[in-house]
Design a protein with these regions (language model features):
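Non-catalytic carbohydrate-binding regions of carbohydrate-active enzymes
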Residues: 39-48, 95, 100-101, 110, ...
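Boundary at the C-terminal end of the N-terminal hydrophobic targeting segment
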Residues: 22-24
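Active-site acid/base region of carbohydrate-active enzymes
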Residues: 26-44, 70, 81, 94, ...
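Bacterial N-terminal signal peptides that target proteins for export
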Residues: 1-11
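Bacterial N-terminal signal peptides
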Residues: 11-19
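Asp/Glu-centered strand-loop micro-motifs enriched in Gly/Pro and often flanked by an aromatic residue
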Residues: 40-70, 78
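The feature captures the catalytic groove of carbohydrate-active enzymes
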Residues: 57-63, 106-134, 165-232, 239, ...
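Aromatic-rich carbohydrate-recognition surfaces in CAZymes
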Residues: 66-174, 203, 328-339, 347, ...
Length: 398
């Protein structure tokens, strides 16, 4: 990451974590410690039992989500919150839910019913797009965290490769057909958004999955040609993403190429997180976040799009609702990692505001003013935690 001079004073009014007027290293350490403790508490509450006795995890501690969601689990696992003793069982369950053709899924009900589409199979007509990538994420993290060599078996890695190739593409990028109304949902945090054409965030998820698969193939001692093919595909996707979605006049990436071409705040931050955005574009994204901070951040939580933008089409067509204007904690770590390039003190404000809101109202799925929804939501803790740990290491020069 491009290093910048740290400012001692925090932009705006900052709620201190450590009782100091300025936010320092100890405060970031305290924020991380608080998220770890709160995340551990929530993940225990989110434990559920399948009918076969297997331990799985709902996305939140309450009863709103009555299934084990793939992407939420993958993101929570990447944040380091899933106990190691349960990871193999969940990975086995998710791998077993992949169809012989290589189609993924959205979630699995506790009775074992596989839901390929969002809304318990009520939204869209075909399997959700991100299911093709998040099984790879789960297998990768399970292998990484447990060291279990069963996840390097040929049948496992071949299934992951089949899934990535099965995902619909056009022009070399993930694709939803504009000719079929809401043919399928994109990724889960946009599952109510009826975007079509080539998809920006899904392209990022595929890049990440291809890189992870290459690492797994390497660890398994697979042929160099297989490993090189996955790395080359990831490299090609990076080039295509930057050629297709970047809006140079605006300074952010667009979410899709046909319907819902709005600018993607979450995705632009994630592109920096993954190293997909070149340095000059990463700096422009960071400056956009700094200069438009008040419109895209609320209590340390992040809007999907710039202020004043709304998706062309959603399942409910309501503005300032759900994924069409609410503010979410899930992407805050990516956002802070990006903003650090140009405004470290504003990062400190974001972290302090996030923790203050979480302490006051709990880690919710999303907020809008005084409105909160779905309390004790796991990715609202796990994904910022992952981001802040990386930020902490970078600030310490590790």
């Amino acid at each position: 990451m491009k290093r910048t001079m740290r400012k001692m004073a925090v932009c705006g009014a900052v709620l201190s974590l450590g009782g100091l007027s300025a936010f320092g290293a100890a405060d970031l350490d305290a924020a991380i410690g608080w998220l770890e403790a709160k995340g551990g508490e929530i993940v225990r509450k989110a434990e559920r039992k399948m009918d076969d006795g297997r331990t799985v995890y709902a996305p939140q501690a309450g009863d709103w989500y009555k299934a084990a969601w793939l992407r939420d689990y993958a993101m929570t696992q990447a944040g380091g919150l899933i106990p190691k003793e349960h990871q193999n069982g969940v990975a086995e369950l998710y791998l077993s839910a992949v169809t012989p053709e290589g189609d993924g899924f959205d979630c699995i009900k506790f009775d074992g019913s596989v839901m390929q589409r969002p809304g318990y199979n009520r939204i869209s007509g075909k399997p959700v797009m991100d299911g093709y990538t998040y099984v790879t994420a789960v297998i990768y993290e399970t292998w990484k965290q447990t060291g279990d060599a069963q996840w390097l078996k040929p049948e496992v890695l071949d299934t992951l490769a089949k899934m990535l190739d099965r995902m619909p593409h056009r022009n070399g990028l993930p694709w939803i057909n504009p000719e079929e109304p809401h043919e399928r949902a994109p990724w889960g945090f946009n599952d109510s958004v009826q975007m079509t054409g080539n998809l920006f965030f899904m392209s990022l998820l595929e890049i990440r999955a291809r890189r992870e698969l290459a690492t797994l193939l390497t660890a398994a001692g697979r042929p160099d040609a297989e490993i090189a093919a996955q790395r080359q595909r990831a490299t090609e996707l990076v080039l295509l993403v930057n050629r297709t979605f970047w809006d140079d006049a605006f300074g952010l990436y667009r979410a899709a190429t046909v319907r819902c071409r709005q600018h993607d705040v979450w995705g632009s931050a994630y592109a920096v997180w993954l190293g997909v955005a070149p340095d000059d574009r990463a700096d422009r994204i960071a400056r956009y976040f700094r200069d438009h901070y008040e419109g895209i951040v609320q209590r340390g939580q992040i809007r999907h799009m710039p202020a004043g933008e709304y998706w062309d089409k959603t399942c409910w067509d309501k503005k300032d609702h759900y994924q069409n204007g609410h503010f979410w904690g899930t992407p805050t770590g990516w956002f802070c990692w990006t903003l650090e390039r140009v405004a470290p003190s504003l990062v400190d404000k974001t972290v302090a505001d996030l923790i203050a809101d979480y302490k006051a109202r709990g880690p919710n799925e999303r907020v809008f003013g005084e409105t909160t929804s779905c309390p004790e939501y796991l990715t609202s803790v796990a994904t910022p935690l992952q981001g802040l740990k990386r930020l902490q290491a970078a600030r310490k020069g590790l």
